[in-house]
């Protein structure tokens, strides 16, 4: 009976946490609204075949091939096969141009931008993680300067180089030869290219909904939809051929470069033979966009999942430990200021205004003092956050600031629960506490997906790289204008007690389900 009662209570908590002050009518409507960009992309893709051929632009059947060879190197001797008359010169220049591309565009330019931002302009916060100290760094551990931290450098400055290196490693193992094709590899590539392509965004969305602040999932949906809409419009406006087309018909073919050309499943035909079906073959024959190689939306979708999993997964910081002594003290000026004008009166649930380039005066959140403004705003429990230049210079070295009475007031979050350290320090939670699992699966998935697309002969490295650029651009836009200023800042205000939580948004979905239990900390990114 106890098991049945516990199961029933869990189901009830899941139901209530899912609705969260909504009803069964508004919940589906809210879901449709949040995922509207994704539905718009799917609608455009499905109806692309209705566009009259006379209105469509010319097909660029050679561009992706040459861009791949001269930007990433001709390791498969493709130029020798397709253009045997100029083999030696083209092979030499492919490595000269790819080396120049690597050095100039993937190393020097990102390094110059990083140096300009952090050493010339002296920006003292993570450009893409305004609240990095709050979400990602242990409270009592001394940190390196913000500009030298791995999180600051890796996203976005080192990502192009990371992509180039991994793509070429994957390219080596995806060589198009019968000797390289095996049943195991075929099925693994099919699983990644088809199954994970459909399920990974869903699993990422579930993770963000369960473990992250309300609104994070909407940002993921909008970032995904924005990049995919831009991608499918690029397919329609600048159509390019996939590698299977070049390998099947040759680089100089013109007969099949037209909009009546049927799609081709390429390496997935081998999977059909293994499984005894024709699903992949028939599915690609009916594709409404045959010449939609650049950008690769398989790469863009996988990379968007990667970006959100890597950037949002957090480690355990013992902020709400029942052992005491775990007060948040940040010793550097690397976290975005929750300014006075962002504080709201009781009952005011408006979203903080969008932060623009002219508003980027950063203050250390760990040195912001809660100021009692009850005399200024009648009967308001809210607090205002403000740090003047004088306060900045007189701040305590431990991350607190010294007020007029000479007292230090460290930043304090509202305790929604107390973490049982005897429970959270068990060996079973060690890997989870470091936030390692989401990052590991994100990296593994993107590496596997890039390999699968090349192994199945569906995309060049160039296609995949452009897909990464689309994903990064979409992520930066949504992160800058929505996620950081409108979602995370608002949520931190609520957790600080500065904003009244009238919509039960202080807790994540997982926290609501396990509210009052020993597992609540597990779903709290601030814990």
UniProtKB/Swiss-Prot annotation:
Subcellular location: Golgi apparatus membrane
Catalytic activity as recorded in UniProt: an alpha-D-mannosyl-(1<->6)-1D-myo-inositol-1-phospho-N-[(R)-2-hydroxy-very-long-chain fatty acyl]-(R)-4-hydroxysphingoid base + a 1,2-diacyl-sn-glycero-3-phospho-(1D-myo-inositol) = an alpha-D-mannosyl-6-(1D-myo-inositol phospho)-(1<->6)-1D-myo-inositol-1-phospho-N-[(R)-2-hydroxy-very-long-chain fatty acyl]-(R)-4-hydroxysphingoid base + a 1,2-diacyl-sn-glycerol; a mannosylinositol-1-phospho-N-acyl-sphingoid base + a 1,2-diacyl-sn-glycero-3-phospho-(1D-myo-inositol) = an inositol phosphomannosylnositol-1-phospho-N-acylsphingoid base + a 1,2-diacyl-sn-glycerol; a mannosylinositol-1-phospho-N-(2-hydroxyacyl)-4R-hydroxysphingoid base + a 1,2-diacyl-sn-glycero-3-phospho-(1D-myo-inositol) = an inositol phosphomannosylnositol-1-phospho-N-(2-hydroxyacyl)-4R-hydroxysphingoid base + a 1,2-diacyl-sn-glycerol
A Gene Ontology molecular function term of the record: transferase activity, transferring phosphorus-containing groups
Cytoplasmic side: 1-24, 121-152, 212-219, 310-435, 483-527
Broad enzyme group: transferase
Membrane topology of the entry: Multi-pass membrane protein
The entry's keywords: Golgi apparatus, Membrane, Transferase, Transmembrane, Transmembrane helix
One Gene Ontology CC term in the entry: Golgi membrane
Transmembrane segments: 25-45, 100-120, 153-173, 191-211, 220-240, 289-309, 436-456, 462-482
Keyword Transferase: yes
Pfam families in UniProt: PAP2_3
Biological process per Gene Ontology, one example term: sphingolipid biosynthetic process
Membrane side Lumenal: residue ranges: 46-99, 174-190, 241-288, 457-461
Gene deletion effect: Fails to accumulate M(IP)2C and instead accumulates increased amounts of the precursor mannose-inositol-P-ceramide.
Disordered: region residues: 331-404
EC number annotated for this UniProt entry: 2.7.1.228
Low complexity bias spans: 376-389
Note: Present with 606 molecules/cell in log phase SD medium.
Function: Catalyzes the addition of a phosphorylinositol group onto mannosyl phosphorylinositol ceramide (MIPC) to form mannosyl diphosphorylinositol ceramide (M(IP)2C), the major sphingolipid in membranes of S.cerevisiae.
Name under which the protein is recorded: Inositolphosphotransferase 1
Organism: Saccharomyces cerevisiae (strain ATCC 204508 / S288c) (Baker's yeast)
Gene designation: IPT1
